[in-house]
Amino acid sequence: MKHHLLLFSLLLIMLVPASAQKAGVNIFSYNVHNCIGMDKEQDYQRIAKVIQQADPDIVALQELDSVTERNKGVYALGELEKHTGMHGIYAAAIPFQGGSYGIGMLSKEAPIKYEVIPMPGREEKRALIIAEFKDYVFCATHQSLTAEDQLLSVPLILKALEGIHKPIFLAGDMNSKPQSKPQEMLGKQFTTLNDTAVYTFPADLPNRCIDYIYAYSQNGYQFDVQQQKVIEEAVASDHRPVQVVVQIKGK
């Protein structure tokens, strides 16, 4: 009888779908170029469709207008919230044409809390969003084009993460190649989760990786990358989006 019960239990385990097992965090990073594609068309629904098809839990977004003149007063993140059904966080980096220009975040789960931290940028100021969720903290940014500013940003990011005891992810357009000094500096504190040999920019004929997803490696958590890809979307924006599914392991 016990033998039959054991076999029955094993059969049930085998029949449980993978989705019912402990799922990884599906992370997405996308420089959306204010939803203007390589065809010069601005299309919020097209960008939203790219995001929806990937079905991410959390998204870092770069290059968003908020009620600017060139955007005809439209709040770009609001359009993406509407079309994806996700929660949005916007961070203005600079005032621009009667509104602002900055970065954003979309999430299936409403954040517990978040903060926006200014980041250096001599060509234009930058920003970092740090949002806390139930099981992790997610950070989104868009770094300066200047290597000196990128290097200055690293200690500011690390300072902002002090005292956080949950697993931490960071994602965004970092404007630096994998072998650069800023990436070397980040690599001492973070593990890069995406495959940097797969290029992300420009979208039509990519020849470099400048978009990244990282896990913070200094507060004891381990991470198992279950999936990593660059979405082969060549038109919707001037960057291709990066996607990683990662399982958080205990300390």
PLM feature segments, named:
Residues G24, D39-K40, L64-Y136, Q226-E233:
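Structured beta-strand-rich core segments of catalytic domains in phosphoester-bond hydrolases
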Residues L7-L15:
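Bacterial N-terminal signal peptides
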Residues V116-I117, A147-L151, K159-F169, N175-K251:
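Metal-dependent phosphoester-hydrolase catalytic domains
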Residues Y44, A48, V74-L77, E81, ...:
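Extracytoplasmic/secreted envelope proteins and their assembly/folding machinery
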Residues N26-V32, I47-N71, F138-T141, I157-E184, ...:
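Active-site beta-strand/loop signature of hydrolases that rely on acidic residues for catalysis
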Residues K2, A18-H83, P95-G99, I248-K251:
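N-terminal, active-site-proximal structural segment of metallo-dependent hydrolase catalytic domains
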